[in-house]
Amino acid sequence: MSELKIKAAKAAIAYIEDDMVIGVGTGSTVNFFIKELAAIKHKIEACVASSKATEALLRAEGIPVIDLNSVQDLPIYVDGADEVNERGEMIKGGGGALTREKIVANVATQFICIVDESKVVKRLGEFPVAVEVIPMARSFVARQIVKLGGDPEYREGFITDNGNIILDVFNLNFSTPMALEDSLNVIPGVVENGVFAKRLADKVLVASASGVNNLK
């Protein structure tokens, strides 16, 4: 599996141009992308990290990291996915960085999703949806999610970079992913959720034994 993730990471490097500021996601496939990016770090201006973990990895490779607030133009954002379909709709947030990932993805002009073939699905929903929640609202939000048909589980011992908690939600109805994304986000106490149906991936680079293909 690591070989496929490396393939996908290498394919994303082809989209990096000189003097770019690059948004960098979070997760195991992205970690391989950071390794590849380190080889051309002299060509890029800097990176915007979607998590403290990614920022630490970038700095360890000697890659400059800047704050999103200091960026007016972000040409590209590279990140993985827990699930992705052919339309570029995704479930993200297995690593708990979904809120910052969604923010950076929306700032970026182009979102490149890098995955191995196991992450490609016809219908989203087998992987649970991470929902970032203000701690005091955990029980209330969980009850509201049950009303939507979901089965929330508290992610024990995990605190997000924003100081919040995560509910992992199973068995949600993905017949209309965009409506689901909205339905979760309007619950008071919800910060963000891991359904990416509004900000789609512009390119989905899928690595398999036969090579890397763009799903879109």
Swiss-Prot record:
Its EC number is 5.3.1.6. Keywords: Isomerase. It catalyses: aldehydo-D-ribose 5-phosphate = D-ribulose 5-phosphate. One of its GO terms (molecular function) is ribose-5-phosphate isomerase activity. GO terms for biological process: D-ribose metabolic process; pentose-phosphate shunt, non-oxidative branch. Pathway: Carbohydrate degradation; pentose phosphate pathway; D-ribose 5-phosphate from D-ribulose 5-phosphate (non-oxidative stage): step 1/1. It is an enzyme of class 5 (isomerase). One of its GO terms (cellular component) is cytosol. Substrate binds at residues 26-29, 79-82, 92-95, 119. InterPro entries: NagB/RpiA_transferase-like (IPR037171), Ribose5P_isomerase_typA_subgr (IPR020672), Ribose5P_isomerase_type_A (IPR004788). Signal peptide: none annotated. The active site is at 101 (proton acceptor). Homodimer. Catalyzes the reversible conversion of ribose-5-phosphate to ribulose 5-phosphate. PANTHER family: RIBOSE-5-PHOSPHATE ISOMERASE. HAMAP family: Rib_5P_isom_A. Belongs to the ribose 5-phosphate isomerase family. This is Ribose-5-phosphate isomerase A. The gene is rpiA.
